[in-house]
Amino acid sequence: MKPSERRKARHCATQAIYQWQMTKANVGDIEEQFKIDQDTKGVDLNYFRDLLFGVALHCNELDKVFAPFLSRPLEEVDMVDKAILRLATYELTRRDDVPPRVAINEAIELAKSFAADDSHKFVNGVLDKVIKSLNKR
């Protein structure tokens, strides 16, 4: 598996998590529809699935990890930023095979791709505090 396959999986998972947050549809249905509608060539589909289902399953727990470091209530955080924070926090807390710096750098790149202009700074600041709270470097 190449790093680019995981990067593409994160990219797709961010979109799918966003869709799940907005629609509250069944995660399995979102996964299947995503595979039909999107070009998944070069995507680590197992990793995509793990991220999507992992975030959905552990959503409340993930929110509790990063919410204390937000500058505003969780309900006021942009849905794209929330999807990225949930995905990265999942990697930081549930994926020992992903170095913390990789999880943060990938989240920053996702924010640059999908979110508002300065979202990458917001995401970086929150996740830096998450790492410190988890005693990871």
UniProtKB/Swiss-Prot annotation:
GO terms for molecular function: RNA binding. SUPFAM superfamilies: NusB-like (SSF48013). Involved in transcription antitermination. Required for transcription of ribosomal RNA (rRNA) genes. Binds specifically to the boxA antiterminator sequence of the ribosomal RNA (rrn) operons. PANTHER family: ANTITERMINATION NUSB DOMAIN-CONTAINING PROTEIN (PTHR11078:SF3), N UTILIZATION SUBSTANCE PROTEIN B-RELATED (PTHR11078). Pfam families: NusB. The keyword Ribosomal protein does not apply. The keyword Repeat does not apply. GO terms for biological process: DNA-templated transcription termination; transcription antitermination. Belongs to the NusB family. Keywords: RNA-binding, Transcription, Transcription antitermination, Transcription regulation. This is Transcription antitermination protein NusB. One of its GO terms (cellular component) is cytosol. It comes from Aeromonas hydrophila subsp. hydrophila (strain ATCC 7966 / DSM 30187 / BCRC 13018 / CCUG 14551 / JCM 1027 / KCTC 2358 / NCIMB 9240 / NCTC 8049).
